[in-house]
């Protein structure tokens, strides 16, 4: 289960927004500090989940951005069927913050999800935001 707390800048005495979160994944967590990086034209990154995930899927490649932003994020090492490292959330040099959230879906939505689904999962989306969002 994941939890997140957001307090907007209009609700704090100092005008600073706060974003916090907690995830109870059964794995190691660590802080990463990543520099701004240039990537070769045609580079890709792997996203998605494996057939072992609770909601199975297929790993796929998507284009890597030409440049990713300097950021710090919390990563973790394990969630069944999701390749490590996973991103809990973070903050980039532009002040964009993100926190991943996982929640189960309604039974009928789970049943209609194909077992060969592709595309970014919740942790991939958090990583993409801290890497790319200006």
Locate predicted features.
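A conserved hydrophobic secondary-structure block that centers on an alpha-helix together
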Residues: 119-134
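A contiguous strand-loop segment
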Residues: 2-123
């Amino acid at each position: 289960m994941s939890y997140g707390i957001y307090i907007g800048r209009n609700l704090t005495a100092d005008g600073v927004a706060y974003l916090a979160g907690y995830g109870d994944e059964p794995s190691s967590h660590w802080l990463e500090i990543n520099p701004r990086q240039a990537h070769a034209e045609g580079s890709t990154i792997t996203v998605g989940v494996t057939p072992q995930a609770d909601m199975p899927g297929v790993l796929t490649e998507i284009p890597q951005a030409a440049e990713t932003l300097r950021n710090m994020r919390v990563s973790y090492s394990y969630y069944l069927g999701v390749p490590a490292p996973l991103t809990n959330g973070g903050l980039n040099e532009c002040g964009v913050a993100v926190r991943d959230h996982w929640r189960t879906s309604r039974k009928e939505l789970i049943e209609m999800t194909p077992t060969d689904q592709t595309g970014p999962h919740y942790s991939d989306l958090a990583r993409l935001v801290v890497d790319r969002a200006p």
